[in-house]
Design a protein with these regions (language model features):
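Flexible, acidic/Gly-rich N-terminal and inter-domain linker regions that tether
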Residues: 1-127
Length: 127
């Protein structure tokens, strides 16, 4: 009986491996927070944000500071992200209906050069 269970388990594992084969091939290309270019971009953006708020590392590590400094104005957001007129208009429209804000930390994680960056799409309010 245990041999049958083992064979069933092995067969099921092979089926599951087949289902994720495309992911296993693509995963080497998927950026993570551990990639050097991502770390450098984060540090650069963090430094820019700290300078804007005239803050220090201890502020950055304080969640109260993060909440108090959340960005909810287009004029401040434009200091960190290049927004075209259509994007500004979309943010203004969203802002008329919904409250929005992005914390300094979350902003530092966004690839501001990639408008299709998942964090950009989740954080910057547009239709």
């Amino acid at each position: 009986l245990s041999k049958d269970k083992r064979e069933i388990s092995i067969k099921r594992a092979e089926e599951l491996k087949e289902k994720i084969a495309d992911y296993m091939d693509a995963r080497k290309k998927i950026k993570t927070g551990f990639d050097e270019d991502v770390k450098k971009r984060y540090e650069k953006q963090k430094k820019k944000i700290l300078a804007f708020f005239n803050a220090e590392e201890k502020d950055w590590q304080d969640w109260h500071w993060q909440v108090r400094r959340r960005i909810n104005e287009i004029s401040v957001l434009k200091e960190f992200i290049n927004l075209d007129e259509d994007e500004i208009r979309a943010i203004e429209e969203v802002g008329q209906r919904f409250r929005w804000a992005v914390s300094p930390y979350y902003l530092s994680l966004i690839d501001t050069d990639d408008k299709q960056d998942p964090l950009y799409l989740q954080s910057i309010p547009t239709f």
